[in-house]
Amino acid sequence: QSMKICKFYVKGKCTQENCKFVHKDNICRNYFLQAKCKHGDKCKFDHSYKIRKHPKNTTDFKPNHKRCSMNIEIADGNQEKYNKDIYKNDVIIVKNMMQQEENYMYYNQLLKEIEACGIPEDELMKLWHGDTHLIADDKLDWKEKVPTFEKIIKRIEEYFGMVVKSTRFNHYKDTNAWKPFHHDAAAFKPEIAKYQNMTVAISFGVTRDTAFEFNDNKVTLSIPQHDGDVYTFSENVNIEWKHGILQVSPENYEEKGRLSIIAWGFVEQK
């Protein structure tokens, strides 16, 4: 209703012969234009109308030199090492760090080796809590029999200058498999945070979205992880954001799998 009132008429100076807005008398000019009147309820003019304020499209004209809550870096997987400083709020995306020669090469090789490691699948692969996907049981002796896994971990160590403290082999058998939003243990266990300040994940197989959820306002963002892609997150990202793997909607279901190799460890960060 307030937008139908001619603000220029209220001000006493509308010059349009056929104005498309209403020229209404007895409106309180101060209340209409400023949403306040010093006379309050005693004002003899009408307080039923006030102009709608348009939000400003720019609110801060001072440069802000703070680093963002999340800073995303895109890195070259063809390089021998990551060539930038790593910051506590970094997420680093690396394309084809393992330089695989054809699609699904590492996916197929990893599955072949872990199936041939000598441990029955029902003993080796355990459901992650929540029963959302499978992980290889680290308590069993399989890693030395999966040389491609050790090759990948070594590449992670060398590329990021990382001291790897623990690892994981995840298997998402189809697009129904997913991982809920969560923090890695270093976010809330000081004894782990002493030697783990960075998570590195490399994906093989079908493209899936990794996503982050900000603690304060639940804002989310997602980053597609293609075959061979790496994403990392540093100390503050793990504390301030949860992360997970989104489930694909049922109508887009595919019986295609994804493997992710995770390394947790320590990297010098600014």
Language model: regions and residue ranges:
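Non-heme Fe(II) oxygenase metal-center motifs and adjacent flexible, charged/small-residue loops
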Residues: 54-270
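Cys/His Zn-binding finger modules involved in RNA regulation
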Residues: 1-69
